[in-house]
Amino acid sequence: MSGRIVITGAGIISAIGVGKEETLRSLVARKSGVGRLRHLQTAHSDLPCGEVNMSDEELKNAIGVPADRIVPRTTLLGIIAVREAMEEAGVKGSDRAALISGTTVGGMDVTERCCLQGGDQSLFRLHDCGSCTDEIADFFGGFGLVTTISTACSSAANSIMLGADLIKSGRCDVIVAGGAECLTRYHLNGFNSLKILDSEPCRPFDATRNGLNLGEGAGFVVLESEEHALKRGAVPLGILD
């Protein structure tokens, strides 16, 4: 398919906001979401991180998931961002729609707890990165194609590029693409072993910079061909170029 690829919806949840409006207000106010960990239990709680300021229980309540259901935090973050993007775009799942999510650890927060505290061994299925994407897709239903990209820091960007290719090839009309990732002990232990985590809020443009801070969140966009978007009366937010 020739023509431009446009963005018709976007959603985000991060350490500085739930949704685009709150995130923008925080950015304008120069609010930092980096601080001490409050929800992830780890020996490295003194390391500053960009943690979403909601517990798993609060995230579940926000999307109507039963409190006693075991759901990876990555899944919960992803659902919130995907919901905002799809609602803004005015789209639903269909045979011609795809969900492409980028993640590195998937449901590792759940499997870490299983290893340390014991529990239902069947939950180790959530260790698979693709399990979170499947759960996000199941929450909304109707996607003709569901796939996961796991290429470390480039995962979400590669998800968007794959989505554009699927539209250009004519395989899909609508793509929901992006990424979701929660903080885990694996992240902190791994990066800390490399000696690259700053014990203070990072300052990348300072001559005395001393490392980075980790964070969590989710962000997704809805992609369509410009022709498809205009045909259904959608207003493009931007162009993917």
Q: What are the residue ranges of the model-derived segments?
A:
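Condensing-enzyme catalytic core mediating Claisen C-C bond formation in acyl metabolism
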Residues: 4-8, 28-38, 201-241
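Acidic, glycine-rich active-site loops and adjacent beta-strand->loop/helix elements
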Residues: 11-13, 103-106, 151-155, 179-184
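Phosphate/pyrophosphate-binding loops at sites that engage ATP/ADP/AMP, CoA/4′-phosphopantetheine
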Residues: 83-97, 139, 228-235
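Flexible, low-complexity linker/loop segments at domain and module junctions
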Residues: 1-7, 93-94
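Conserved catalytic cysteine-centered active-site region
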Residues: 1, 36-80, 96, 106-117, ...
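Beta-strand segments within the central parallel beta-sheet cores of soluble alpha/beta enzyme folds
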Residues: 6, 96-101, 147-150, 172-180, ...
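Short, well-ordered amphipathic alpha-helical segments that serve as non-catalytic structural scaffolds
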Residues: 77-89, 130-132, 224-226
